[in-house]
From Swiss-Prot:
GO BP term (any one): mitochondrion localization
Any GO molecular function: cardiolipin binding
Disulfide bridges in this chain: none
Function description: Involved in chromosome segregation. Facilitates nuclear oscillation during meiotic prophase I, the 'horsetail' phase, by acting as a dynein anchor. Essential for anchoring dhc1 to the cortex. Required for proper sliding of the microtubules along the cell cortex, which leads to the proper U-turn movement of the nucleus.
Organism the protein comes from: Schizosaccharomyces pombe (strain 972 / ATCC 24843)
Pfam families, A to Z: Mcp5_PH
Protein name, per record: Meiotic coiled-coil protein 5
PROSITE patterns for the chain: PH_DOMAIN
Record's subcellular location: Cytoplasm, Cell cortex
Gene of this entry: mcp5
Keywords noted in UniProt: Chromosome partition, Coiled coil, Cytoplasm, Meiosis
Chief place of localization: cytoplasm
Keyword Cell inner membrane: no
Occurrences of domain PH (ranges): 847-958
Coiled coil region boundaries: 68-91, 152-240
Length: 968
C-alpha cells in the first residue's frame, strides 16, 4: 500500500511540476507582452518628436489645428491601451495565484483519491468509442458492396452501349452507300426525262405541220365535191355532152366498186370466224406484242390507201376537163342520184355489220328492231361490248373500225366535242339512261345487265377544250381520275402522256346513249369523253399506245368535222390520205418508245407494291387503335378488386354487412334484380340511403385477410363440421347483427401454414362475392333469439375462388402464438413483438383501404418536368396489390361521371423532394411508386400519413415494416 501511495505522490508531483512550468510559460508570455508594449510606446514617442520637427520646418501653418487634433487622439488611444494591458496582467496574476492554491489543496488531499473509478470510466469510454467505430465500419462496408454492384452494372451497360454504337455506325455506312446509289439512279432518270421532253417538243412541231397540210387537203376535197354536184345537174337536164356523161358514170361505178371491195375485204380479213377462233386460242398461251400488231395494221391501211389515191388523181383530171365544158352553174341539183349513192353505201354497211355480228360472237348478238322505228345511221352502234372487245383483241385497231363504218365515226366525233364543252345535268342523264334501256333488247338476261351497266352515264368534271384546235390535251382529264398512289413518283413523263392505264381497263364502254328523232337529236346527246375513245389493250405499254391512237384520232376528227356531206368514198379517202402522211412519223416514234416503256414498267411495279404496303399499314393501325382497351371506368365499378389478369367491374363495398330488408328494398328499386346489379358492379343499397363508413369491424376483417394473401382459411365443409361453434354471447356484435365463428382447435388446421397456397382453376374467374349464410341455432333458445339469428348474416369474402369462405377469429389474433405465426408468414425476422402487432397492421391496412387525398405529379420518368400538379383521392386494394385513384372520393360523394384508374404496384422508393416539388403545406419527402407502366409520384399532406402509406406498402410487398439501419 505504501508503494502505491508513493507512486501516486510521485505522479501528483509530476503533475504539479507540469502545472508550474505552464505557469512559468504564461509569466514569460506576459513579460514579452510588456516588452512589446514598451517598444510600441517608444515608437510612438519618436513619431511625435518627428512630427514636432516637421512642424518647425514647415512654411505653411494651415494644418496646425489638424495635427493637434490627431495628436490628441493618439494620446487618448495610447492611454486606453495601457489600461487594457495592465488589466490583463492583473487577471493573469490572479489566475496563477488561484492555480497555485488549487495545486496545494490537491497535493494535500491526494491520499483520499480513488484511482479505480478513474480507470473504469476510462475503459467504458474507450469501449463505447470502439463499438461506435465498429458500427461505422460495418455501415461503410455495406455501402462499398452496394457501390461495387453498381459499378459492375455500369460496366455491363457500357459494354452493351459500345456494341450498339458499333452496329449503328455500320448501319450508317450502309445507308450512305445506298444513298449514293439512289442519287445516281435519280440523275439517270432526270437525264431520261430531259431527252423525252425534247422528243415531245419535236413531235408537237410535227403534228402542227401535219394539221396544216390536212386542212389544205380538206379544202381541195370540198372543191372536188362541188364539181361532182355540177356534173350530176348537167346529166339530168339531158345536155349534148356525151363524154361528160360517160366520165360521170365511170367515176360512180368505180367509187361504188372500190367501197364494196374494201368493205368486203376488210370484213373477210379481220372477222373470219375460223381465223378469229384460232387466233384467240393462241393468245391464251402466247401473248402478242401490241407494237407489232399496230405496225401491221398501219401498213395494211397505207397499202389500201395507195390504190384509192390513184382513183382520186384520175377523178381530178376528169373534173378539170369537165369544168371547161360546163357553162351554167346556177341550176338546182337533182336529189335522185345522190340519194341512190347514199342508199347503196348504207346497204353495204348493213351487210358488213351483220356479217361481223354473226362471225365474232353469234351468242351475244343483238336483235335489231324494224328499220322504220329508228334511223339507219344508228346501226353501227348496236354492237355489244363483248363483240368490240373480241374484235380489238384480234389485232383490229380503230383505223380498221373507222373504215368499216365511217358514218358512225362522224357522229362520234361531233358528240365527242360537244360532250367536252357541254354541261350535263342529272335529269338529262336519267332520261338518257331510260332511253338506252328501251332501245336495247339483248337475247340473254345476263348480257342485258352488262349492257345496261355499260350504257349508264356518269357526271364528270368538264374541261374547256377548243373544238377548232388540232390538239386535245388528255393529261388534265386523266389526272383527276388517277389516285395518288398510282402515279409515278420518281419518273414522270410529260403532262400530255398518260400516267397509267388501269382506269382505261376499268371504265370501258363503247355504247353511247341513243335517242330517237334523227341526226339532230343524236348530235345533242352528251356522252362522257373517255367512253367513246378508250381502246382495250394489253397491260404492256398501254399508256403509250393510247396516246398515239388518241393523237391520230384527233387528226381524223379535225378533218371530218368540217365536212357536211356523209359520203363513204370521201371519208375513206381523207382518212387514208392522212394515214400515209403519218406513217413515217409513227415508225420513227415506235423505236424510241419501246425502250422507254421497258424502263418504266419496272418502276411502275415497284411503286404499286409500295402503295399497297402503305395501305396495309394504315389498315393495321386502324385495327390496333380500335383494339386497344382504355375504356373509362365509371363510379362504383372497381374492376381491379378481382384478379388483375381478367378485367371485371366489381365493387369491394359489397363486402359490408347488409340486412335482408335492404336487399329486398334494392330488388324493388332495381328492375333486373339484386344479383344482376352485383354482376354489373352496381351497389345493392337503395339510392335514397347514402353510404356511411361506420362498419369498422368489417373493415378490420378485410384488413386481417390481407395478412394471409390468396389463402383459403376455412371452407364450407369445415363450417358444417363440429369444429365450428357459435359465439353465444354476441356482446360485441349486437350493433351489426352478425354472428362470430370461433375455431376450437385453431392450431390443428394446416390451412394456416405458409406453404399451403390454393390453386384456382384456369378457366374459372375469381372475384369477391357477397354470400349470405344462415347461422345455426340451438333448440333451447327463445323465439326472439331465433328471429334475430335468422335475420343475421355473415358476409364472406373469397380470396381464391367463389366456393371458399373467409371468416377470421378476432380473439385469437391477440395471442402471442398468432403474432409469431404472422411474423413467420410475413418473413419479418429481426423485429420485436410490438412492431408485428395485429392491431397496428389492421389500422394501417384499414387506413390505406379507406384512402387519402394526396398530391399527384405528372407520370414522367425523370424529375425535370414537375410544373403541373393536382389533387387526387388514392386508396389501395391489398388483395391484388393495386393502387387506385380518382378525382374525388367515390365512396361518399355522388355523381357517376367519376372515373377510377388503377395500376399494379411493383415497388416503392422514398426521395427527398427537390426544389421544384417543395411546398410549405406538404411533407418534404416524396413517394415514387414503381408500376408496370410509369412511376407515379405522390406527396402526402403530413408526415403521419406519409409513414402510414410507406409501412402499408412494405407490408403488402412482404417486406420489413421498419428500416433496420445500423446505429452510429
Amino acid at each position: 500500500m505504501e508503494k502505491k501511495q508513493d507512486n501516486e505522490v510521485e505522479l501528483y508531483s509530476i503533475d504539479l511540476k507540469n502545472r508550474n512550468e505552464s505557469a512559468k510559460i504564461k509569466l514569460a508570455y506576459a513579460k514579452a507582452l510588456e516588452e512589446s508594449i514598451l517598444c510600441e510606446t517608444r515608437k510612438i514617442e519618436q513619431e511625435i518628436k518627428d512630427q514636432v520637427v516637421q512642424k518647425e520646418n514647415k512654411t505653411y501653418f494651415n494644418n496646425k489645428f489638424d495635427n493637434r487634433y490627431k495628436l490628441r487622439d493618439l494620446e487618448k488611444n495610447l492611454a486606453e491601451e495601457e489600461v487594457r494591458i495592465t488589466e490583463m496582467l492583473t487577471i493573469q496574476r490572479q489566475d496563477i495565484a488561484i492555480e497555485r492554491r488549487k495545486n496545494t489543496n490537491c497535493f494535500s488531499e491526494s491520499s483520499q483519491v480513488d484511482q479505480y473509478s478513474v480507470t473504469e470510466t476510462n475503459l467504458q469510454y474507450a469501449t463505447n468509442i470502439g463499438l461506435n467505430l465498429l458500427q461505422q465500419l460495418r455501415y461503410l462496408r455495406l455501402q462499398l458492396s452496394e457501390k461495387e454492384d453498381l459499378h459492375k452494372k455500369l460496366s455491363v451497360d457500357n459494354a452493351h452501349l459500345i456494341k450498339q454504337l458499333d452496329l449503328l455506325s455500320s448501319n450508317m455506312k450502309t445507308l450512305m452507300k445506298e444513298k449514293t446509289k439512289v442519287q445516281g439512279q435519280r440523275d439517270l432518270l432526270e437525264q431520261r426525262l430531259q431527252g423525252l421532253m425534247k422528243k415531245l417538243t419535236e413531235v408537237e412541231s410535227l403534228t402542227v405541220s401535219l394539221n396544216d397540210e390536212k386542212n389544205k387537203l380538206t379544202l381541195e376535197l370540198t372543191n372536188l365535191r362541188i364539181c361532182l354536184h355540177e356534173l350530176q345537174l348537167n346529166a339530168e337536164k339531158g345536155e349534148t355532152i356525151d363524154e361528160s356523161e360517160d366520165s360521170k358514170n365511170t367515176l360512180v361505178t368505180e367509187d361504188e366498186n372500190d367501197d364494196s371491195v374494201f368493205l368486203e375485204s376488210s370484213s373477210d380479213k379481220y372477222f373470219d370466224s375460223s381465223s378469229f377462233d384460232a387466233e384467240q386460242e393462241e393468245k391464251h398461251d402466247f401473248p402478242i406484242d401490241p407494237f407489232l400488231s399496230l405496225e401491221s395494221n398501219v401498213q395494211t391501211s397505207v397499202s389500201q390507201s395507195s390504190a384509192v389515191l390513184k382513183s382520186i388523181n384520175l377523178a381530178k383530171q376528169e373534173l378539170v376537163s369537165v369544168n371547161h365544158l360546163v357553162a351554167d352553174d346556177t341550176k338546182t341539183p337533182s336529189p335522185n342520184l345522190s340519194s341512190e349513192i347514199i342508199e347503196n353505201t348504207k346497204a353495204d354497211i348493213k351487210k358488213s355489220i351483220r356479217s361481223l355480228n354473226k362471225a365474232v360472237s353469234p351468242e351475244n348478238s343483238i336483235d335489231i328492231e324494224d328499220e322504220t322505228d329508228r334511223d339507219d345511221e344508228f346501226i353501227c352502234f348496236l354492237l355489244s361490248y363483248q363483240q368490240l372487245q373480241k374484235a380489238l383483241k384480234s389485232n383490229l385497231g380503230l383505223f380498221q373500225l373507222s373504215c368499216l363504218y365511217p358514218l358512225s365515226l362522224n357522229h362520234l366525233i361531233q358528240s365527242f366535242f360537244q360532250s367536252l364543252t357541254s354541261q350535263i345535268s342529272i335529269k338529262d342523264i336519267d332520261s338518257k339512261n331510260k332511253q338506252v334501256i328501251k332501245l336495247f333488247k339483248p337475247t340473254k338476261s345476263s348480257d342485258r345487265q352488262e349492257i345496261f351497266e355499260l350504257a349508264q352515264f356518269e357526271p364528270r368534271q368538264k374541261f374547256p377544250i377548243d373544238t377548232n384546235s388540232s390538239k386535245c390535251d388528255m393529261s388534265a382529264s386523266t389526272e383527276m381520275h388517277l389516285k395518288d398512289t398510282e402515279k409515278f413518283a420518281n419518273f414522270k413523263l410529260k403532262e400530255n402522256i398518260l400516267n397509267h392505264s388501269s382506269i382505261y381497263e376499268r371504265d370501258v364502254s363503247y355504247l353511247p346513249a341513243l335517242n330517237k328523232g334523227g341526226r339532230e337529236n343524236y348530235l345533242n346527246n352528251r356522252v362522257s369523253s373517255y367512253r367513246l375513245v378508250k381502246p382495250i389493250l394489253n397491260s404492256y405499254g398501254n399508256h403509250v399506245l393510247n396516246r398515239i391512237q388518241h393523237d391520230i384520232l384527233e387528226n381524223h376528227f379535225c378533218c371530218l368535222k368540217n365536212v357536211k356531206d356523209f359520203v363513204c368514198g370521201a371519208n375513206t379517202i381523207s382518212m387514208q390520205w392522212n394515214l400515209q402522211k403519218n406513217m413515217e412519223f409513227i415508225s420513227s416514234v415506235f423505236s424510241l418508245i419501246k425502250n422507254e416503256v421497258n424502263d418504266t414498267s419496272a418502276n411502275s411495279v415497284i411503286l404499286r407494291t409500295d402503295a399497297l404496303s402503305n395501305v396495309a399499314t394504315t389498315r393495321l393501325k386502324r385495327k390496333l387503335t380500335s383494339a386497344i382497351i382504355d375504356c373509362s371506368i365509371p363510379r362504383r365499378r372497381l374492376r381491379h378488386y378481382s384478379n388483375p389478369e381478367i378485367a371485371e367491374f366489381k365493387n369491394f363495398r359489397l363486402s359490408t354487412d347488409i340486412s335482408h330488408s335492404n336487399v329486398r328494398n334494392s330488388k324493388k328499386l332495381c328492375s333486373n334484380g339484386s344479383m344482376n346489379c352485383m354482376r354489373q358492379g352496381k351497389a345493392v343499397f337503395p339510392r335514397k340511403i347514402p353510404y356511411q363508413e361506420h362498419d369498422w369491424e368489417q373493415w378490420e376483417k378485410i384488413a386481417q385477410s390481407s395478412m394471409f394473401k390468396n389463402r383459403s382459411i376455412a371452407s364450407r365443409q369445415s363450417l358444417e363440421t363440429s369444429d365450428v361453434t357459435l359465439d353465444i354471447n354476441m356482446s360485441s356484435r349486437h350493433s351489426n347483427g352478425t354472428s362470430s365463428m370461433l375455431f376450437k382447435d385453431f392450431t390443428k388446421h394446416n390451412n394456416w401454414e405458409a406453404s399451403t397456397y390454393p390453386s384456382a382453376p384456369k378457366n374459372t374467374r375469381t372475384y369477391p362475392t357477397a354470400e349470405v349464410e344462415k347461422t345455426r341455432h340451438d333448440s333451447s333458445q327463445s323465439a326472439r333469439q331465433l328471429k334475430a339469428r335468422s335475420t343475421a348474416t355473415t358476409i364472406s369474402i373469397s380470396l381464391s375462388t367463389v366456393s371458399d369462405v373467409f371468416t377470421l377469429p378476432r380473439n385469437n389474433l391477440k395471442s402471442k402464438t398468432n403474432t409469431k405465426k404472422c411474423r413467420d408468414n410475413l418473413n419479418l425476422s429481426g423485429l420485436s413483438s410490438s412492431t408485428c402487432n395485429a392491431n397496428s397492421v389492421n389500422k394501417l391496412m384499414k387506413h390505406v383501404m379507406m384512402g387519402n387525398e394526396m398530391m399527384k405529379y405528372p407520370r414522367s420518368e425523370s424529375f425535370k418536368m414537375f410544373k403541373k400538379s393536382h389533387w387526387r383521392y388514392f386508396w389501395i386494394n391489398p388483395h391484388c396489390e393495386m393502387l387506385c385513384w380518382s378525382k374525388t372520393n367515390p365512396f361518399i360523394e355522388k355523381g357517376r361521371k367519376n372515373q377510377v384508374k388503377s395500376v399494379k404496384i411493383k415497388g416503392m422508393t422514398i426521395i427527398k423532394a427537390p426544389d421544384a416539388l417543395k411546398n410549405a403545406n406538404l411533407h418534404n419527402e416524396v413517394i415514387v411508386m414503381q408500376t408496370t407502366d410509369k412511376p407515379i409520384v405522390l406527396k402526402a399532406k403530413s408526415k403521419k400519413i406519409h409513414n402510414i402509406w410507406v409501412q402499408a406498402i412494405k407490408q403488402i410487398n412482404h417486406k420489413a415494416i421498419f428500416d433496420t439501419k445500423p446505429g452510429i
